[in-house]
Amino acid sequence: MGVYKKLFRYVPNEKYIGYMTIIVSSISAFLVVYGYYYIFLLLKEAVVKGNYENAGYYSTRIVICLTISAVMYLVSGIVSHKLAFRLETNLRKRGIEGLTDASFRFFDLHSSGYIRKTIDDNAAKTHMAVAHMLPDNSQAFLVPIFAFILAFAISLRVGIVIIVLSVVSGLILMGMMGNKDFMKLYQTSLDKLSSETVEYIRGIQVIKIFGSKLRSFKALHDSIMEYSKYAYDYSLSCKTPYVIYQLIFLGLIAIISIPLSFFLTGIKDPKFMAVELIMIFFLSGVIMVSFMKIMWASMNIYNANFAIDSLEELYEKMQEDKLTYGNRDHFDNFNIEFENVSFSYGDKKVLENLSFSLEEKKTYALVGHSGSGKSTIAKLLSGFYKVDGGAIKIGGYPLSEYTKEAIIRNISFVFQDSKLFKKSIYDNVALANENAGRDKVMKALSLAGCDEIIEKFKDRENTIIGSKGVYLSGGEKQRIAIARAILKNSPIVIMDEASAAIDADNEYELQKAFKNLMKDKTVIMIAHRMTSIRNVDEIIVLEKGNVIERGDNDSLVKTGGLYSRLLSLYETANDWRVSNEKLL
């Protein structure tokens, strides 16, 4: 089958296990039916001929066939599970490798819930198709064939009855499988529900704070209602065919057989007719189980096909913006140049043919309305985004010509929401430079104004962040992040809203830390606090992805352009006070 060709591509060295599973399971299927052949011979000898001398011989053969069949089926299942777990592992590894290669734009366009669900859940969906369906499929398709042969070998009547039952049952089962379009809608709604649920759970703290109800989260509520509709419709579509199917195999044969048994004496060979009825019972049961396996196989194979297609689609999206690096390991200087740079998030164009240059060892501030491209420019400078057109150059060469290590080594970031790991304060800073000694780490902490933070705790710099009783404010976390950047000592520093949420108690210490961090560096900063950028070397004003003004604070104020208006709005907002107005 096509789906197994796709799956086996991810386990090239173990696909022989799959073929081994099919062979062993096929032998098991043959032995099952062969066991029923010996049952027929036993019944024929005992019932028709009244000969019990060979009963022990046939009984032994029945036990041997069915036992070996069960053991071989068990072995095929164990082997197929080994292959399935290896496949799941390789699919997840491929996903993780793709994530490490993907540009940051991929993560901006795809939620973490969607990525986790697509990789983890879809990898798990392939398990059933390989671990269970691989051995089951062989039996499901071969057992009916062997059973048909045995039925006609018994008699023409048994063969015709079994064929008619199989055809009718097959038609009924087709009504239970659902069409591909419906199954695709069902799977898509399930994917959407899983993704929205993950995002909902990750935001549960905010949800509880505001006492929000599920209905207020329209995306999650709609996905739940949509999935419930498809699940209910699918259940209803299966109800009638499944009841009829059960009735035919479990009820109809019994209903017909009871009155028929009263007329056995009027039949030419009633004893053989009785044996035929018993074999119809046996063979119809075997075929019923096989057909149910076929139904589940078709569903699980469809799920596996959908899963592998979803994974490969995600892998392709990861590769679309795969970052490429060069061999240049040294920056001649740290002048920055945007040369006709274009960039978009999906279909949304953010920058188009943007050009400007920044001199090394100067401090620049990016200012503009929300959506003007400030954060995008900062992100592009990181080297972890692939531009749609143009080039970003540092030291006269495009970023794509430098090694990944060179970019990481020479560019530092301080963001508004700095991430600290559940390690000691010391380790959180030291990871910026693994070769730095203890003295350098402690000096970086001191320059970032972290001395008073360390003194609060009994274990000082060895205090584990996130452990019981250890709480850090936003400003304290930010200072530790700045210490990390100071220790890294990169020539280029990018600060995106680094002081946006800092309280008054921390602002003074933070500004001192910023001063130590920015010394003799090329600094690009984004800040909503206009007071924090008045003393920078140059302010660059952006609107709709274009530079419309640039200069120092005084010259831009005199110009009376967008910067002047933004500064005026900031001062007005800063002077706003709650008076004697009644707040509702």
What are these regions (language model features)?
Residues L193, S212, L236-K239, I287-E316, ...:
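Cytosolic ends of transmembrane helices, especially the final helix of ABC transmembrane type-1 domains
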Residues M1-L31, N54-Y58, S80, K125, ...:
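Membrane-integrated ABC transporters
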Residues I27-L41, I68-V71, P135-M177, L236-S284:
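A hydrophobic transmembrane-helix motif
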